Each structure stands twice: as C-alpha cells, then as structure tokens.
C-alpha cells in the first residue's frame, strides 16, 4: 500500500525537528544535515519537488551565542533566532551545493497566512522557486514574531505549508521511531503504531503533550499536524530523522515510522485555510438545535440559534463556534460584529433590520464561510 501511495506523489513537505538537526551538545549536526540533504537530492532526481520546513534556528543561535540553557525570554529567543537562522541557511547551502541544488529562505508569520492575499502570494512564490529547481527552506520568522501571532511550533507550520504548497505528502522527521501507543521514554510496554486511520481522541491522548529542551513540539503537536494535513487530504508520516537513508526508505514503501492516512471527507483548500490559518477573534455559543443543523445538514448559522457571544471582533472576523457545552465544533467568518451579534442573539432573521436599523444578510455565518472541525 505504501509503495503505491508514495509512487504518485510529486510534491513533498519535509519537516525537520531541532532534535534531529542538533547533536547532544545542541550544536548543528552537519553529518545528519548532509545525509538528509543527500536524500532530498535523490528525490529531486526522481522528479519530485521538495519544500523543507526546518526548525533549529534558535537551537543553532543558542550554540553560537554560548547559551547553556534554552532561552526563555522573547528578546533572547529572537536574538538566538537572528544569528541561528543565518547559520542554518549556510549549513543547508553547503550541504545541497555538492548535489547542484540551490536553497531559498522563506520566513513566515501567522499574519502572512491569515491574509488570503498574502497566502496566495506565498503559494505563487513557492511555485516559482520549485519551478526553478530550488529547495525552499521555510521557518517561522522568530526574530519579529510575538506570542499572540505565533504558529505555535513548526509541526503546525508544516501542516499549513502542505496547503500553501499544494503538496501530496508531509514527512515529519523526529528523534524517535514514530508514534507509540504510550510514551516509550517512560513506558517499557509502549509499541510502535505503524498505521493510523483516523485520529481519534484516544490517539490524541496517547500522544501526550511534552516537548524537549531543544525544540518546542512533542508528539502531541505532530499528531495535531497530521490531523490538519489529513483535513487537506494529505497523508503524514512520522519517521526517525537521524536514521541514514530514511527518506529513500520510506519513499520506497518500506514500513518505517507511522503513517497517518487522510480522512475520506477532506476540506477544500480555502476552507482548510479558514479553519487552520486564521486566528479566531472570539466565540459564538449556539444552542443544541443550531449545533445539530450545522453538523448534520451543513446549513448557515442563524441568529435564532445563538445563545451568546464572547470576545470583541468586527464583521468578517474568524470566530469559534461552540455548543452549549462550550466545546468548539466549527469555525467561520462572521457576517456581523460581536456587538451586533449580542443584540441579535436568539432573534429571528426577519427582525435583524428592526433591531439594528440595517442588515448585511439573514445569517450570522454563511455556510460557505463555515467549517466543521
């Protein structure tokens, strides 16, 4: 199955974690980087295009600056990222050069992907670079980003990049063999799970949540990334990044790591952007009847189904849609501001103009701008 699945894939996103790129002292491991670049060069010779999402800038900068511990303040993280990113790019440039490949640095923030125009510009840039045979190396722009607009980690970023790049496969390279039934570092009975078809709450619980002293993402963030990629119809494979020839091994269809297969029902690219690239500005709490209609019938959200609104936002903002239990089940672009929704909650659509003195339409969120998660 794996051989047939991977044979058809022409564009791959490869995400490399900090623990893969660095040695035990936290310095860049040029031997590992060289081997990975050699593997990627082999994919290029097969006619496949590769987009690299690389962690390691802060770790590399920390080593260059002589920091003995992971930086904790934002200025220290950004200083480490500033010096580390140049070191990372130099390492990739030197490692790809013997294979006749050039690299390009692409630094993104969440705001870049939240704007539909900038999102499409990023897609066009990646298409152009790949057309020239260049390897784009993507990282979050840690030097300028603030906590409120961070992607969170590069696992999340790599899942979003699969949509930007219109890729057919996401490869996440980490420091363990793949996804286990429990944490193998603390549970000797943990077993490797070779295939996951549908990410359930049990799978998410088994993933845990802790990261490392070098990177920011644990297995939980990798499973979350696989879930987002699956919603885009893209399979994800988590593999041991330091193993020699690992990319060639997995692309040959051999059973290595953990393969997450996409869901049967996936989102179109615009709705995937809406669900995962935008940062929600508030919450709309709806009654059980509205929740049922949105989940099972794919209808628009009417004011009559709204119980209350939380947060302050303007018309056109992305908002979470939650049931009466306050659990999020959908996201969408609101046709009305939070103050307007507060006045319209529980009312019939026919009364919108009487209440506000104007109307933008009959719905709070149109079904075309609503995504069930």
UniProtKB/Swiss-Prot annotation:
Transmembrane regions: none
Superkingdom in the source lineage: Bacteria
Domain PUA span(s) in chain numbering: 281-359
Substrates-to-products reaction catalysed: L-glutamate + ATP = L-glutamyl 5-phosphate + ADP
Record pathway: Amino-acid biosynthesis; L-proline biosynthesis; L-glutamate 5-semialdehyde from L-glutamate: step 1/2
Keyword annotations: Amino-acid biosynthesis, ATP-binding, Cytoplasm, Kinase, Nucleotide-binding, Proline biosynthesis, Transferase
InterPro entries in the record: AceGlu_kinase-like_sf, Asp/Glu/Uridylate_kinase, G5K_ProB, Glu/AcGlu_kinase, Glu_5kinase, Glu_5kinase/COase_Synthase, Glutamate_5-kinase_CS, PUA
Cystine residue pairs: none
Residues that coordinate or bind ATP: 15, 174-175, 216-222
Main location: cytoplasm
Cellular-component GO terms for this entry: cytosol
Sections of the chain in a coiled coil: none
Pfam families recorded: AA_kinase, PUA
GO molecular-function terms, A-Z: ATP binding; glutamate 5-kinase activity; RNA binding
Record: residues binding substrate: 55, 142, 154
Subcellular location: Cytoplasm
SUPFAM superfamilies: Carbamate kinase-like, PUA domain-like
EC number: 2.7.2.11
Gene Ontology biological-process annotations: L-proline biosynthetic process
Family membership: Belongs to the glutamate 5-kinase family.
Cited function: Catalyzes the transfer of a phosphate group to glutamate to form L-glutamate 5-phosphate.
Designated name of the protein: Glutamate 5-kinase
Gene name per UniProt: proB
